[in-house]
């Protein structure tokens, strides 16, 4: 008996196991069939699906067909087979995601793209309550706003909907880490909510727009928007304080609103908003400071020429800490839909033109009238022209004395100033309507009248070529002359009827150089020059005569200073080393009463005045850093040796300091005796011991000059 009972129990257990196995197999087949019927569980975002979630999704699909059946299009038999308008392509082009929520806040449907923005899949949201994924304070606002949209059947519903910002849970951190649903973060999502009446109640259609998940923090995304939204796609960036005063405006803002004539810095952003859209913008700004991020509905900004710009703004609040104090500002990215006239924006909405928008998108303001008749203008952006030109010791001009009166300083208002005194005089003048200094470099602005030679006048005080600085090409300065060979020209006498025009700018440097008596080298025979500028030499000096020479003035003549007033100095265009007569310095010293040694009543014998030759080694051609060229093997030995010196740095040339030989060393018969001691005599008495044998020295000096070779080198330190 006992054995039969055990045998029956084993048979029953085996039968029960087979029944349970068969039951589980049938349940699995049923769930497999149900899974095949539910469309959303076959998406790629579904990683794991339990049977409870499958039943929840299946029940939600059945509820969706019942509740939203009359508000959704069910007849898909006549669907156009064009792949461009399929459901998949439209969902991919959609910005954000779409949810369908029942009146009891149950999520009936959500698009697959929700996983990109919140990290939650369709199966995680479908069939569950929206309350579980919203911030508690935001759900109360959503419930209140959705009830305002619910209207009885037969009444006209609001086709535009309402905009609100709701904070939803996200399971992806800003750095891309996956989180648990219990430790999820809240993220601001801008929703556009529509409500429709269904058989089972009201159904809400919600479109959510936000930043994709795992793309960084809100501050980082706002900074990225500031940098990368300056594109020609109709978007521009502004930055505001907490009271919406503009602190930064992009260039696109001036292009769209045509506000380049009026600065917008410091003005309120509300001044640009159309009065009819002020309530929309103010409500969006309140939500911005409460939730940190918004996307406004479409509104209008007042533009120039009686036009309106349709704008949609995405704003973000940025919190920063500066010097221990927390601050906050707003970054707005404005997307421009188009520009239309003020009267056109008041047109009643129709089916062909929804929301009162213009038909022609991105219509620009016609600004052709602003550019008719204007010629192209080339603006120098690299070469900056200073306000005053650098003082060149080679281009000095002495103002002529006309009619025994002092010349009047009349600087050309359109010319560039040659000294800081002229600049200060121009800045503090009593004529505010006078034109400012010239903007571009032009030789015509500095040229007055072509200088003419005066045969019987005094010699030119210029040390180098006395032609106008602007008459020489700028590009040849500081570069080696390309032409080789002798550059000698004969002396020429000019007519005495020509007059020199007034110099517009009086140079104190020229006065100082003329007083110092900067002389011409007495040992020049040929015009061979190894300087950078290809300028011809002046008169050739006889090596046998080392005396001081004057152009157009014989050595045996005497010059009375009192009779030189009113005579114009000659500025020869071919003089390179033109002499600087002592008479010019006397005339200037008499005019300004600054000559310490000479008086105006003495005649001067100037054929045998001895002057010490200045050191011309400092007059090597100046080479700018940008004009440096590779030295070739064809350079003269002097230049090649000069550029081979170690630590050679080009520098701006300076005028050599000419020093006259002490007056006691000149021949006794031709000394200029003063009536009393002067400052110059005192200086040479303290620092210079004259030779005692003056007669013997001058006799030997004359013989030595006759025997010395007639070659001259501008670099005495290398010769």
Curated annotation (Swiss-Prot):
InterPro entries: bHLH_dom (IPR011598), PAS (IPR000014), PAS-like_dom_sf (IPR035965), PAS_fold (IPR013767). This is Hypoxia-inducible factor 1. One of its GO terms (cellular component) is nucleus. The modification 4-hydroxyproline is found at residue 621. Residues 296-340 form the PAC domain. Its main location: nucleus. Residues 481-499, 699-708 have a biased composition (Low complexity). Keywords: Apoptosis, DNA-binding, Hydroxylation, Nucleus, Repeat, Repressor, Stress response, Transcription, Transcription regulation, Two-component regulatory system. A transcription factor which is a key regulator in various cellular processes; including environment stress resistance (oxygen levels, hydrogen sulfide and cyanide levels and heat), negative regulation of cell apoptosis in ASJ neurons by inhibition of cep-1 via transcriptional activation of tyr-2, resistance/susceptibility to pathogenic bacteria, lifespan and brood size. Involved in mediating susceptibility to enteropathogenic E.coli. Increased levels of hif-1 activity confer resistance to P.aeruginosa-mediated death but also confer susceptibility to S.aureus infection. The gene is hif-1. Residues 86-153, 222-292 form the PAS domain. Gene3D superfamilies: PAS domain. Pfam families: bHLH_HIF1A, PAS, PAS_11. Residues 1-24, 428-503, 534-553, 658-679, 697-719 are annotated as: Disordered. GO terms for biological process: apoptotic process; cellular response to caloric restriction; cellular response to hypoxia; determination of adult lifespan; heat acclimation; negative regulation of apoptotic process; phosphorelay signal transduction system; positive regulation of transcription by RNA polymerase II. It is found in: Nucleus. Disruption phenotype: Displays developmental defect, exhibiting slower larval growth. Exhibits intolerance to hypoxia in nhr-49 mutant background, with less than 2% animal surviving to L4 larval stage. 66% do not survive embryogenesis when cultured in hypoxic conditions of 1% oxygen. Able to survive anoxic conditions. Inefficient translocation of aha-1 to the nucleus. Inability to acclimate to heat. Partial resistance to paralysis and killing by enteropathogenic E.coli and P.aeruginosa. Extends lifespan in a temperature dependent manner but not when grown with a restricted diet. Hydroxylation on Pro-621 by egl-9 during normoxia conditions is required for vhl-1-mediated proteasomal degradation. Residues 465-474 have a biased composition (Polar residues). One of its GO terms (molecular function) is DNA-binding transcription factor activity, RNA polymerase II-specific. Binds to aha-1. Interacts (hydroxylated on Pro-621) with vhl-1; the interaction induces hif-1 degradation. It comes from Caenorhabditis elegans. Residues 11-65 form the bHLH domain. Induction: By heat acclimation, hypoxia and addition of 50 ppm hydrogen sulfide. By low iron levels.
